[in-house]
Amino acid sequence: MTIRLDHTIVPARDKVAAAQLFAELFGLEMKPVQGRFAQVVVNDSLTMDFADEAEDWDTIPWDPAKTESHHYAFCVGDEEFDGILGRVKAKGMAYGSGPRAHRDRQVSERRGGRTIYFEVLDTHLLEVRTQPSMAG
């Protein structure tokens, strides 16, 4: 069996605003909001499910308002990378070459590809790269 990530829950202060920004930056569509999630379909096997309501999962209480920053990394093609970088720049958002340099307005070039990092709503750090991290 092939293992694929099916979905991940992204804590947000405002699930709709966070999902809309993510969809806009990545050139994706946000699904109509139903229930507690604002979903963005990333590809045929992955959705980013933005949630802004606390929930008690028996022994695991979960509150998006108290969740720390998460890091989400995406591998994309050159055309998608250029589009995402262009939309980040058009919004006047800071971006950079590394997780500790995500505001230096530089594009990292390593492993034969390009990488940028930038913060989105709720201070999550997104990484967009053109080469998989497992490549060399």
Indicate where each model-derived feature is located:
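Vicinal oxygen chelate
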Residues: 86, 91-136
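Short secondary-structure junctions
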Residues: 27-33, 93-98
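Short, conserved charged micro-motifs
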Residues: 17-18, 79-84
